[in-house]
Amino acid sequence: MRLTDFEIEQALDAGTILIEPRPSNDAISGVSVDVRLGNQFRVFQDHTAPFIDLSGPSAEVQAALDRVMSDKIDIKDGNAFFLHPGELALAVTLESVTLPADIVGWLDGRSSLARLGLMVHVTAHRIDPGWQGKIVLEFYNSGKLPLALRPGMTIGALNFERLSGPVSRPYNKRKNAKYKDQQEAVASRISQDS
């Protein structure tokens, strides 16, 4: 069952769900908690690789990713990151989230932003039980105009579901968890797939 606003507040008070910094009461609505945009971004550099063979040898995949991904870009509070039409960028939430082994989270974009062409997550919107860290956002501008994204703006909402019991393989205990304790806009680690 999806948690209600009252249940979310109870989970935050009890420390069952941790969100740092803790959201204000205004950020909690019927079944969700607003999350804000952090200061870190990464983009794809133009024309630095003809393609990436996603099923190729791990070393080749990683070398191609290293060529196409920018270094971390830090945007100061009050300044804007501009996402142009047809561009993909990675960013990170301001908040760090920790979930127990019996709760799964879901990230949803904001309808007001989607109506301008902004996708907040291209596909990956599940936050696994046992997750600990910031959430990487996969921005895509499918609109016609550049979009100015500013750190601290409300960028999406998290909602939570309590499972019938704790999972036996929570994310923070998995040896092969590629994004464990993520605190910045981490690029794809697909080369670590086995």
UniProtKB/Swiss-Prot annotation:
Annotated catalytic residues: 138
The metabolic or biological pathway listed in the UniProt record of this protein is:
Pyrimidine metabolism; dUMP biosynthesis; dUMP from dCTP (dUTP route): step 1/2
MF terms from GO for this chain are:
dCTP deaminase activity; nucleotide binding
Q: What EC number(s) has UniProt assigned to this enzyme?
A: 3.5.4.13
Keyword vocabulary terms for this entry: Hydrolase, Nucleotide metabolism, Nucleotide-binding
Q: Which InterPro entries match?
A: dCTP_deaminase (IPR011962), dUTPase-like_sf (IPR036157), dUTPase_trimeric (IPR033704)
Q: Which domain of life is it from?
A: Bacteria
Q: Give positions of region: Disordered.
A: 171-194
Sequence positions that bind dCTP: 110-115, 128, 136-138, 171, 178, 182
Q: Give the record's GO biological process terms.
A: dUMP biosynthetic process; dUTP biosynthetic process; nucleobase-containing small molecule interconversion
Catalytic activity annotated for this protein? dCTP + H2O + H(+) = dUTP + NH4(+)
Write down the top EC class of this protein: hydrolase
Q: Describe the family membership recorded for this protein in Swiss-Prot or TrEMBL.
A: Belongs to the dCTP deaminase family.
What quaternary structure, including any partners, is listed in this protein's UniProt entry?
A: Homotrimer.
**What's its job?**
Catalyzes the deamination of dCTP to dUTP.
Q: Please identify the protein, giving its name as recorded.
A: dCTP deaminase
> In which organism is this protein found?
Shewanella amazonensis (strain ATCC BAA-1098 / SB2B)
Gene coding for it: dcd
